[in-house]
């Protein structure tokens, strides 16, 4: 998971 995108980046 990516904390900058809450796991929702493309």
From Swiss-Prot:
Q: Which organism is it from?
A: Allium sativum
What this protein is called in its record is Alliumin
What is the annotated role of this protein in its UniProt record?
Answer: Has antifungal activity against M.arachidicola with an IC(50) of 1.3 uM, but not against F.oxysporum. Has antibacterial activity against the Gram-negative bacterium P.fluorescens. No antibacterial activity against the Gram-positive bacteria B.subtilis, B.cereus and B.megaterium, or against the Gram-negative bacterium E.coli. Has antiproliferative activity towards L1210 leukemia cells with an IC(50) of 8.33 uM, but lacks antiproliferative activity towards HepG2 hepatoma cells. Lacks mitogenic towards murine splenocytes.
Keyword set for this entry? Antibiotic, Antimicrobial, Fungicide
Q: Name one GO biological process term.
A: defense response to Gram-negative bacterium
């Amino acid at each position: 998971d990516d904390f900058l995108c809450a796991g929702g980046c493309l």
